[in-house]
Amino acid sequence: MLVWLAEYLVRYETAFNAISYITVRAILTLLTALFISLWIGPKVIKRLQILKFGQEVRNDGPESHFAKKGTPTMGGVMILFSIGVSTLLWANLANPYIWVCLFVLFGYGAIGFVDDFRKITRKNTDGLIARWKYFWMSVVALVAILWLYWLGHDTDATRLVIPFFKDIMPQLGLFYIVLSYFVIVGTGNAVNLTDGLDGLAIMPTALVAGAFALIAWATGNVNFAEYLHIPYIKYSSEVVVFCTAIVGASLGFLWFNTYPAQVFMGDVGSLALGGALGVVAILVRQEFLLVIMGGVFVVEALSVILQVGSYKLRKQRIFRMAPIHHHFELKGWPEPRVIIRFWIISLMLVLMGLVTLKLR
């Protein structure tokens, strides 16, 4: 929005031309999202306490979690607000990719909001019926994917980039829709499953979003895309603004979500952030890189799949409890140790993912 204002004001003062640079707007977006989160955080927490929107805890979970019962949840609304406002302020709203990102973010956020609200009103951990939850997640994902397919079905925007192989980039055709569906829905659920400890999901989210900001910038720059042997995608550079908004909002939320948490993001935050990371990976054609950089999310999701599958087939559990972060808690690891070690692993995976861009 401010891009258009700057284009007008530059006639009178050339300094406003700086706002046209994506790097300047990326930094300003991050700071805006961060400050909004820090500013509204105490107000949101107080309002959630007044409304008695408290966290419900699983009866079969670690005993240390019983103390968390009643902690304000649905704090993800301030993440969404921070991302939305900062993106609308600093992004070029003529770019269709921005609207696709916001559509998935708020679409999944709405699904998570309903899920959280049902848990709170029913005073248990059961939210939306699973089939309806996946139905609406699928609807949002497919609308976004078909929108993107229509925008770039005959360009590099639908090629599959494979790490380490610079000359292998097959055109996906209609399979683009199938792959993109599983990326968005899968990432949404994976981040949701990871969000079980104070700050566990939000820091990896910020790290992955920050890495995708760099990748989006390179993908939208003809020279860097050619240098790195990745597809040049016309609209992708503006996705940098959206990614840095996620980073800023996530860091702001972490201020209140760090152990011991004053607020939890709830499904309204975790589903939205997961869906957002998924759609960004699709936009910059780095689905495989998302698997590497978001390895913590992948392992958390796989631990649940393996646990459920093993119990149904063999009546035996692989882990003491799933997702896997609870397994380590039940082994005696203090919660802060689990969180920090998962953060370290996430940082290493993000750096490994970025390195693969050059090792091609």
Curated annotation (Swiss-Prot):
GO term, biological process aspect, one:
cell wall organization
Transmembrane residue ranges: 21-41, 73-93, 94-114, 132-152, 168-188, 199-219, 239-259, 263-283, 288-308, 338-358
Q: In which pathway does it act?
A: Cell wall biogenesis; peptidoglycan biosynthesis
* Cofactor(s) for this UniProt protein: Mg(2+)
InterPro entries from the entry?
A: Glycosyl_transferase_4, PNAcMuramoyl-5peptid_Trfase, PNAcMuramoyl-5peptid_Trfase_CS
- UniProt xrefs under CDD domains: GT_MraY
Q: Return the broad EC class.
A: transferase
Q: Name one GO cellular component term.
A: plasma membrane
Please give, as recorded in its UniProt entry, the membrane topology of this protein: Multi-pass membrane protein
Record keywords, A-Z: Cell cycle, Cell division, Cell inner membrane, Cell membrane, Cell shape, Cell wall biogenesis/degradation, Magnesium, Membrane, Metal-binding, Peptidoglycan synthesis, Transferase, Transmembrane, Transmembrane helix
Pfam families per UniProt: Glycos_transf_4, MraY_sig1
Q: What is its main location?
A: membrane
Q: Which E.C. number(s) belong to this protein?
A: 2.7.8.13
Q: Localized where?
A: Cell inner membrane
Transferase: is it a keyword of this entry?
yes
* Any one GO molecular-function label of the UniProt entry: UDP-N-acetylmuramoyl-L-alanyl-D-glutamyl-meso-2,6-diaminopimelyl-D-alanyl-D-alanine:undecaprenyl-phosphate transferase activity
- Catalysed transformations (reactions): UDP-N-acetyl-alpha-D-muramoyl-L-alanyl-gamma-D-glutamyl-meso-2,6-diaminopimeloyl-D-alanyl-D-alanine + di-trans,octa-cis-undecaprenyl phosphate = di-trans,octa-cis-undecaprenyl diphospho-N-acetyl-alpha-D-muramoyl-L-alanyl-D-glutamyl-meso-2,6-diaminopimeloyl-D-alanyl-D-alanine + UMP
Homology family:
Belongs to the glycosyltransferase 4 family. MraY subfamily.
Checking HAMAP family in the record gives: MraY
PANTHER family from the UniProt entry: PHOSPHO-N-ACETYLMURAMOYL-PENTAPEPTIDE-TRANSFERASE, PHOSPHO-N-ACETYLMURAMOYL-PENTAPEPTIDE-TRANSFERASE HOMOLOG
The free-text function statement in the UniProt record for this protein reads:
Catalyzes the initial step of the lipid cycle reactions in the biosynthesis of the cell wall peptidoglycan: transfers peptidoglycan precursor phospho-MurNAc-pentapeptide from UDP-MurNAc-pentapeptide onto the lipid carrier undecaprenyl phosphate, yielding undecaprenyl-pyrophosphoryl-MurNAc-pentapeptide, known as lipid I.
UniProt protein name: Phospho-N-acetylmuramoyl-pentapeptide-transferase
Provenance organism? Haemophilus influenzae (strain PittEE)
What gene is it encoded by?
mraY
